[in-house]
Amino acid sequence: MINHFKAEFYKLRHSKILITILGVCAAVIMVSFALGDMTFFGAGDGTESVIGFQAKCYLSSEIPTFQTVARSSLAYTAFFWIIGILFATIFFTKEYNTGTIKLSVAYGTKRTILYYTKAITILVVSLITYLIFVATFFVIEIIQSGYIPTASEVINLLGWALACGTVLLALESISIFLCVVIQNTGIVTGICCLYVFSGASVYLMLWSDMETVSIPLKFFVYGNPMYYWMNFSSCRTMGIIEHLPFYFIGCISLLIVGGLIMIREEIK
């Protein structure tokens, strides 16, 4: 099993996918400098109650607070999730599209081993890259704002970043499952992007009155990554974090179902 993980990391290290992903992440960071102060998907009556994308929206440029620095550090998370979807779908389907996976199966490697080693490699690399992504923004915000965080504040930000990272793993589990079922990178990416951005639109309309909405809409909102990002990015966790384990377990279950489908699926 360890050799299979080594093989996956070797393929990733010697492919253009990782370089491309890192390049796109760097481009997003550069775009953040160009855009400056921004608030997307905002709603509410003032900065404290706004949900969603908030970049450099300081209540006071002279006396920045930890929450405003943390918001800016997490602001571009949704953009990274799209990058993560592209990475997961392209890297997972590459060997299927080229047909090279047949060689591994012909040499007696079990399909489930190939499936799970590739899936776990995607999830681990994505999580590490995302944490570096957030840390980079955090350092930039500290330098630009002059705010010096305490150790407990850094731990708080790490907790929010890990929560968003957990959502990323769940989202990529969905995309990997769809890759097994649909086997088309473009369609899978389109479905996942529609799933993400439709969640933002629906939640914006409902977020201030979630207690009265219908159960199907609640399932859609609580099962959408934008629900978590738009709250975590605004430092809102009360009543939000409780839904995350169910979302994560549900998506990981799809990943397991994908492995079962993989056993019976014909490799073309």
Each predicted region: which residue ranges?
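Residue-level recognition of membrane-helix boundary sites in multi-pass small-molecule transporters
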Residues: K16-T20, I113, I187
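Junction motif at the cytosolic side of a transmembrane helix
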Residues: K11, F248-K268
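Secretory targeting signals
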Residues: C25-F91, Y115-Q183, F197-S201, S208, ...
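Aromatic- and glycine-rich beta-strand/loop motifs that create alpha-glucan
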Residues: M1-C25
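Central hydrophobic cores of alpha-helical transmembrane segments
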Residues: I21-V28, I187-G199, L217-F220
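Transmembrane helix boundary and interhelical loop/hinge segments in multi-pass membrane proteins
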Residues: F87-Y107, R111-T112, A119
